[in-house]
């Protein structure tokens, strides 16, 4: 008991020293905790947050976690309390077997700071295991001649606990022949031996029953028992003897299964059954019994399972030899396992970033890596590296930890991802290595602007394109990815001819296709300059511009326009004069036309499409000049009708036609004399008016019917007055009727000859109007022109006039329009005019029938139009000065029935001349004096 107490005190002193040493080490840098084994899951181990200088909230926010190597996690972190707790029940015996102290080492990784803190937790043993023997019963024989003092080794008990909780003492049940002696072995465990105290007598007691008790030093004390049966046999005086006092062998760990490792040998000089020796393991660990096999007859030891240097570096076992009479001998066998390089390094990626932006600076941490090799010596010394052509490097930390960092700035546009191979190799022979791959994606940032495929674009578009048609497309590309490469197109706002660009063009924001919002006209504009912007969807967005030139191509969409002779609204033209004495090639007139197109679409050619007298006239192909093709003959008709076609050279060609009326005569007076023989009749117009009113009355309501009746009565009254005036013609001063001629196409005719005709000198209230039928195709024949007649008026009416009929007012020399008086509707005329402009087709037809030309002015050649005799001043129209402004003012020559006013020229008033309505009328001078 004294010895046991002494041992207990020593153990406590050793534990105290060991604890002080651990505390000193923890104070030097490591964090040290202790926890009893078999505590419940979640038991408190230590305040790790306090020891690390962290707040409990930082355990969750900072990514603090436990990094352990190759085993199930034994501990966990409580983020709320900041404490280290057990993750499961811990069995110290399973974890450390008989090792003391039992330390569990791991690292605390603070990912936010990328720091490692080593932590050691000592597992404190508790008395949770009872000492046990491998056998429940032990039976052996002892010769009765065995001398007192003979020692018999007994099986020793095993207690998985350590320290005071391990096996501390043995006790043998009381027996007069046997006693117990416990020997302290050199390798640590106690070896119980049974000592024969007095000689045996088989005849007195053949079998002895003993109980061996093994007890530990825990609180409470635990114990195990072994029943021993000793059979006393007859005398066998020679026990087996081994050839060696101890067997020792070195075996490489990679020996094949079933390899004979060594052979023990024991001899017995006895004969017969007393000399037959059998072998068996005695007092071996259960793991040893699982790995090795002992042949009971030959003593051969072989391995049943692979040897592992990393598990056991040396195996110690005891082999027992027993003869047939029960005598035994024991020998110790030591098998040392030699390490071979059979374990490749283990690479563990503790923390890794799978994606990194391309603009991160060098030194960015990508991964945290640990390397471990279970071999020893050079076989367990490892190095770690990556390929040298990568923009990364490995930096070694503590305890075989490495971190992978960027060595230079990454560029996703060059390489969008990396497959990094990390190789760990040991120094064994042959060297073993392990490769681990990390896939790293380089994420994009918006560092590239869109780039167009061309520096500038040009496109040619035919005019008259349909609205909404696709006319061009631009494309740009962006080296970035995802939304940073999603390009939208837009037009930079500009103006074209005062209108916004968006009114003409639009662009598809996704495809870059340009669409026309309207049909373009080459004659309006011929090109457009615009800029297209390509913008990506990055943050912030980047953009680039490109210039685009759109050129319109002319299409033949405009027919030639005939400038001269100008076409009045009713389609008729003026009358051109060709003298009878004209030689072949005589210039009669000239057709002037233009085309708003360009190029060959505007090249014009002229041809004579139709003529009333084929072969009489010709038209210049490119000049449009109408000339006589032969000399004029008496048999040629006085009126020649020509249809001239003007055609451009477009595809398809467009054309326009004009009808010319050529009068064959030497003088204008001849034509007027021939045409004046026709008697004007006012009744057709009255009948037309009546018919018009009847048709209109059928289409309108009853209200309009009353109005038509009143209007008809008014017209009949006027007609009655005119008949009364004609009946009083006895006192009317006569004038040849041939001096007043109705001419077909009067409005065009009077573009050249501007005259106005009046019957009396002072006809302010009533003028005699001679409506003339519209002869559209032929001039009045010569026979009709030879008829003589006089127009008469009542003498009383003539006496009221102050000017003679023979005196004619000079024509209005300002017969051209000013810029503000170009042909247009009545609403565009000068406000100074007192006349009324016809505003419907009916009034226009009446106006044409009532306009007369002055014969006397044409006969004496005093016209202010200019030109030589017989030409009627036509040459002035063919010169370069002829423009569209050379249009007569018809209002100087017009009398409106039912009105007491005539249309006048405001310019005449400014010149101090009398209005055309007064100066243009023929008045008799004699009557003027009488008045």
Curated annotation (Swiss-Prot):
Glycosylation sites: 265, 419, 545, 685
Signal peptide: 1-28
UniProt membrane topology term: Single-pass type I membrane protein
Primary residence: membrane
A GO biological-process term: nervous system development
Chain intervals with Polar residues compositional bias: 805-840
A Pfam family: Cadherin_C_2
Transmembrane segments: 693-713
Residue ranges occupied by any Cadherin domain in the UniProt entry: 29-133, 134-242, 243-347, 348-452, 453-562, 570-682
UniProt-annotated stretches for the region Disordered: 801-840, 901-931
Example of a GO MF term: calcium ion binding
Biased composition (Basic residues): 921-931
Location of the protein in the cell: Cell membrane
Chain ranges on the Cytoplasmic side, renumbered to this chain: 714-931
Highest taxon, organism lineage: Eukaryota
Alphabetical keyword list: Calcium, Cell adhesion, Cell membrane, Glycoprotein, Membrane, Repeat, Signal, Transmembrane, Transmembrane helix
GO cellular component: plasma membrane
Extracellular topological domain: 29-692
Function: Potential calcium-dependent cell-adhesion protein. May be involved in the establishment and maintenance of specific neuronal connections in the brain.
PANTHER family: CADHERIN-87A, PROTOCADHERIN GAMMA-A1
Name recorded for this polypeptide: Protocadherin gamma-A1
Species lineage: Eukaryota, Metazoa, Chordata, Craniata, Vertebrata
Gene expressing this chain: PCDHGA1
């Amino acid at each position: 008991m004294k010895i046991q107490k002494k041992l207990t005190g020593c153990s406590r002193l050793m534990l105290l020293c060991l604890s002080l040493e651990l505390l000193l080490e923890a104070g030097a840098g490591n964090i040290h905790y202790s926890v009893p084994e078999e505590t419940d899951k979640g038991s408190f181990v230590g305040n790790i947050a306090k020891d690390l200088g962290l707040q409990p909230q930082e355990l969750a926010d900072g990514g603090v976690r436990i990094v352990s190597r190759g085993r199930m996690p034994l501990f966990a972190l409580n983020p709320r309390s900041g404490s280290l707790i057990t993750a499961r029940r811990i069995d110290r015996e399973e974890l450390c077997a008989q090792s003391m102290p039992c330390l569990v080492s791991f690292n605390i990784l603070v990912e936010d700071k990328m720091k490692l803190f080593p932590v050691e937790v000592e597992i404190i043993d508790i008395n949770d295991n009872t000492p046990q023997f491998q056998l429940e019963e032990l039976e052996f024989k002892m010769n009765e001649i065995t001398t007192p003092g003979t020692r018999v080794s007994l099986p020793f008990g095993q207690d998985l606990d350590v320290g005071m909780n391990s096996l501390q003492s043995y006790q043998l049940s009381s027996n007069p022949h046997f006693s117990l002696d416990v020997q302290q072995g050199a390798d640590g465990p106690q070896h119980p031996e049974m000592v024969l105290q007095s000689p045996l007598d088989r005849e007195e007691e053949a079998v002895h029953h003993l109980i061996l008790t093994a007890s530990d030093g825990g609180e409470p004390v635990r114990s195990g028992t072994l029943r021993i049966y000793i059979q006393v046999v007859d005398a066998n005086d020679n026990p087996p003897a081994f050839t060696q006092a101890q067997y020792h062998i070195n075996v490489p760990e990679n020996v094949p299964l079933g390899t004979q490792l060594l052979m023990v040998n024991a001899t017995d000089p006895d004969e017969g059954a007393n000399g037959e020796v059998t072998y068996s393991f005695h007092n071996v660990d259960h793991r040893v019994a699982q790995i090795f096999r002992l042949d009971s007859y030959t003593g051969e030891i072989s391995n049943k399972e692979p040897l592992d240097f990393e598990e056991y570096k040396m195996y110690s076992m005891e082999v027992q030899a027993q003869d047939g009479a029960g005598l035994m001998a024991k020998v110790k066998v030591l098998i040392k396992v030699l390490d071979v390089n059979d374990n490749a390094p283990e690479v563990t990626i503790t923390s890794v970033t799978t994606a990194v932006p391309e603009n991160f600076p060098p030194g960015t941490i990508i991964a945290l890596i640990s390397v471990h090799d279970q071999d020893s010596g050079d076989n367990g010394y490892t190095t770690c590296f990556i390929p040298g052509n990568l923009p990364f490097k490995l930096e070694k930390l503590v305890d075989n930890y490495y971190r992978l960092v960027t060595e230079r700035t990454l560029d996703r546009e060059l390489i969008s991802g990396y497959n990094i191979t990390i190789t760990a190799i040991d120094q064994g022979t042959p060297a073993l290595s392990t490769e681990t791959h990390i896939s790293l994606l380089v994420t994009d940032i918006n560092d590239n602007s869109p780039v167009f495929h061309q520096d500038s674009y040009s496109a040619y578009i035919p005019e008259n394109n349909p609205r909404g048609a696709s006319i061009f497309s631009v494309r740009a590309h962006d080296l970035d990815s995802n939304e940073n490469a999603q390009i939208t197109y837009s037009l930079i706002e500009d103006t074209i001819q005062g209108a916004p660009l968006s009114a003409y063009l639009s662009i598809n924001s996704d495809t870059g296709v340009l669409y026309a919002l309207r049909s373009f006209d080459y004659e309006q504009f011929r090109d457009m300059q615009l800029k297209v912007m390509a913008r990506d969807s990055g943050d912030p967005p980047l953009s680039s511009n490109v210039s685009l030139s759109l050129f319109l191509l002319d299409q033949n969409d405009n027919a030639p326009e005939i400038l001269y002779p100008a076409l009045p609204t009713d389609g008729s033209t003026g009358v051109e004069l060709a003298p009878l004495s004209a030689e072949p090639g005589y210039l009669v007139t000239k057709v002037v036309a233009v085309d708003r197109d360009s190029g060959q679409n505007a090249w014009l050619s002229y041809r004579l499409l139709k003529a009333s007298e084929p072969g009489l006239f010709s038209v210049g192909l490119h000049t449009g000049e109408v000339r006589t093709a032969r000399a004029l003959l008496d048999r040629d008709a006085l009126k020649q009708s020509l249809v001239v076609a003007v055609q451009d050279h477009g595809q398809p060609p467009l054309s326009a036609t004009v009808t010319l009326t050529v009068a064959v005569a030497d003088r204008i007076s001849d034509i007027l004399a021939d045409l004046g023989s026709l008697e004007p009749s006012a009744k057709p117009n009255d009948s037309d008016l009546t018919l018009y009113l009847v048709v209109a009355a059928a289409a309108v309501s009853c209200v309009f019917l009353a109005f038509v009746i009143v209007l008809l009565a008014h017209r009949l009254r006027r007609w009655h007055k005119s008949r009364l005036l004609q009946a009083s013609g006895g006192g009317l001063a006569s004038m040849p009727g041939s001096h007043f001629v109705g001419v077909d196409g009067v409005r065009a005719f009077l573009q050249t000859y501007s005259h106005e005709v009046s019957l009396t000198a002072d006809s302010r209230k009533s003028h005699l109007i001679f409506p003339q039928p519209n002869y559209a195709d032929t001039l009045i024949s010569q026979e009709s022109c030879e008829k003589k007649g006089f127009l008469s008026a009542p003498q009383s009416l003539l006496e009221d006039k102050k000017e003679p009929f023979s005196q004619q007012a000079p024509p209005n020399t300002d017969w051209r329009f000013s810029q503000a008086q170009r042909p247009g509707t009545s609403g565009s005329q000068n406000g100074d005019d007192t006349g009324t402009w016809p505003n419907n087709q009916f009034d226009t037809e009446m106006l044409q029938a009532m306009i007369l030309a002055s014969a006397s002015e044409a006969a004496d050649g005093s016209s202010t139009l200019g030109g030589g005799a017989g030409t009627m001043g036509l040459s002035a129209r063919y010169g370069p000065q002829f423009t569209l402004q050379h249009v007569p003012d018809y209002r100087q020559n017009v009398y409106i029935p039912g009105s007491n006013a005539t249309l006048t020229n405001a310019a005449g008033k400014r010149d101090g001349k009398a209005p055309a309505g007064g100066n243009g009328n023929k008045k008799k001078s004699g009557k003027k004096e009488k008045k």
